[in-house]
Amino acid sequence: MRLSRYFMPILKENPKEAEIVSHRLMLRAGMIRQQSQGIYSWLPLGKRVLDKVNAIIREEQNRAGAIELSMPTLQSAELWQESGRYDAYGKEMLRIKDRQERPMLYGPTNEEMVTDIFRSSVKSYKDLPLNLYHIQLKFRDEIRPRFGTMRSREFMMKDAYSFDLTREGAEHSYNKMFAAYLRTFDRLGLRAIPMRADTGPIGGNLSHEFIILADTGESEVFCHKDFVDFDIPGESTDFDSVEGLQAIFDKWTSLYAATSEMHDEAAFNAVPEGERLSARGIEAGHIFYFGTKYSEPMGAKVQGPDGKEHFVHMGSYGIGPTRLVPAIIEASHDDNGIIWPASVAPFDVVVINMKAGDQACDDTCELIYAALTKAGKDVLYDDTDDRAGTKFATADLIGVPVQIIAGPRAVANGEVEVKDRKTGARETMTIEAAINRFVA
């Protein structure tokens, strides 16, 4: 992508409305723009990151055996009246009527709808277990939306829903998502700590929030510091192994970890003083087991091996991609801008032409740009006629992991400079070596 033809409206000054680092940097880097209170457009640079976050989420959901579908944003109020949540949910839910005056709602979550899909399609235990997920925009009318897309009214959510014949089966499905979430956050460059949490309006009797430690977090959290160094389940994790997944769950729930809502001061004080960690955190994911809370009132049941009908046991599992993007920035930035993990960076490398219009610099940059693009790399080519300082500031601000810098003096020697955005380390190498670093 040539920067001269790309839409990336950089802001030179810090926006006054931005309260936290991620909000400020996302606005300055031209990733998002506010349309109304708590509602944002994702501009091209931001959407590239969001798409890569979603790709990782999809890969890990699929690896754990979940199946993607797509459900509508608008839902019938009748389904929510069936479950008993229509009146209980409160003013966060946006209620509307269609032209026939039928009550509808802009879905804040999808337990009712997915249960309706299940009950009309699945009749036998032989079709279980089943886990369905989708990635969709949702709306919750927050009293005080703030921090950009960290706490917005319209947001994107990956929500998955599991269906099992028994509680034991449902707990295995819960453990699958538990392990999948640990892997997802790790691949995003984040360390998320699962903490026992309140079930809230979703309901149920088992729930964990996945918390990313950050000074700007909304919640106060308390945990054992060893969580910071726990090993993440590997790529070879067997998601069909009941014992293996239970061992992962047991390990990650063996030490004290709780949000402020579930905090037990006495239990926390029992942790040796030097091993206690109290901090602030960002909720990045939330999983629930709620048994037959929805299947019973909505009649979602299957015929079991005994020939009798059984209400299915359910769980739901949410991750907010539009919240994860700022969470990654909160965890990885410096005074100059964002430092993206390679897995979600909008581009793999930025090629910086220090003297656009100089034949040698132009030819060198075109050569590198073409070679890396042909190799399947996402490349941003700064071919603008901006000053060198502006080019460097832009590259640092948007956080692309590697910068390849081509100036007249280096190019005359057949060389370019390669800079690592995270460490700041610079290395001069031949043009061929710079290309081979990415295509070898």
Curated annotation (Swiss-Prot):
The keyword Transferase does not apply. The keyword Magnesium does not apply. GO terms for cellular component: cytosol. GO terms for molecular function: ATP binding; proline-tRNA ligase activity. It is found in: Cytoplasm. Its EC number is 6.1.1.15. Keywords: Aminoacyl-tRNA synthetase, ATP-binding, Cytoplasm, Ligase, Nucleotide-binding, Protein biosynthesis. It comes from the Bacteria. GO terms for biological process: prolyl-tRNA aminoacylation. InterPro entries: aa-tRNA-synt_IIb, aa-tRNA-synth_II, aa-tRNA-synth_II/BPL/LPL, Anticodon-bd, Anticodon-bd_dom_sf, Pro-tRNA-ligase_IIa, Pro-tRNA-synth_IIa_bac-type, Pro-tRNA_synthetase. It catalyses: tRNA(Pro) + L-proline + ATP = L-prolyl-tRNA(Pro) + AMP + diphosphate. Catalyzes the attachment of proline to tRNA(Pro) in a two-step reaction: proline is first activated by ATP to form Pro-AMP and then transferred to the acceptor end of tRNA(Pro). Homodimer. Belongs to the class-II aminoacyl-tRNA synthetase family. ProS type 2 subfamily. This is Proline--tRNA ligase. It comes from Rhizobium etli (strain CIAT 652).
